Swiss-Prot record:
Keywords: Acetylation, Calcium, Metal-binding, Muscle protein, Repeat. The modification N-acetylmethionine is found at M1. CDD domains: EFh. Signal peptide: none annotated. Pfam families: EF-hand_7. InterPro entries: CALM/Myosin/TropC-like (IPR050230), EF-hand-dom_pair (IPR011992), EF_Hand_1_Ca_BS (IPR018247), EF_hand_dom (IPR002048). PANTHER family: MYOSIN LIGHT CHAIN 1, 3, TROPONIN C-LIKE ISOFORM X1. This is Troponin C, isotype alpha.
């Protein structure tokens, strides 16, 4: 985690907290994959599992923030904030099918399902409720950015 600056740690903490909906202090390995992919990291399932097994030092199958930050640092060390923002904006634009500056929670649900088909409807509801802070049923770019970068 030493290779991350304060801003990166803060962004990772916010992303971690967004998916740690029960505030248990850990996320699942599947969720790690979702967060990394939403941040623009291209990683195969096999490589992800390998990195997670190396990172999950206590072998709990649950990824605590420290473990998550160390894992993410391996991928973020080459990224800077501007590149991350650009990648997120591009990802958002692709899913903003109407070009009107927002995606519906239904589209976000589809994205999350694509990233991890093991998410249950309850998991998806919790994640979406956390992201769609104003309850509008839509996610604008600022809500999306806030979730991903703080």
């Amino acid at each position: 985690m030493d290779s991350l600056d304060e801003e990166q740690v803060s962004a990772l903490q916010k992303a971690f907290d967004s998916f740690d909906t029960d505030s248990k202090g850990f996320i699942t390995p599947e969720t790690v994959g979702i967060i990394l992919r939403m941040m623009g990291v291209k990683i195969s399932e096999r490589h992800l599992q390998q990195v997670i097994s190396e990172t999950d030092e206590d072998g709990s199958g649950e990824i605590e923030f420290e473990e998550f930050a160390e894992l993410a640092a391996k991928f973020l060390s080459e990224e800077d904030e501007e590149a991350l923002k650009k990648e997120l904006k591009e990802a958002f634009r692709i899913y903003d099918r109407g070009g009107d500056g927002y995606i519906t929670t239904q589209v976000l649900r589809e994205i999350l399902k694509e990233l991890d088909n093991r998410l249950t409807e309850d998991n998806l509801d919790e994640i979406i409720e956390e992201i769609d802070e104003d309850g509008s049923g839509t996610i604008d770019f600022m809500e999306f950015m806030k979730m991903m970068t703080g």
